[in-house]
């Protein structure tokens, strides 16, 4: 997604990357989505798997909300400082429609099997 947005053209990956954020796992972003992103997205960054898990854990422990990993990807740059926004109001939509609480990593829920 980031490669295509930066290049301004569809970038196809040979393999689908492994990630906990399965809602974002794709070989490429289509032409229409890329056009919308190029028009409205100001900047884009990536986050590591560990940062996704840390964000999931934070939201669960502090807000008592289970969000899907793809949703955590949108919030993680604020926690890591990749999107610095001191003193600014920032809106992030958190969703949980694509999550199976029984398959969340143990480090998020604190469950021991």
How would you name each of these model-derived features?
Residues 1-113:
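PLP-dependent amino-acid enzyme catalytic core
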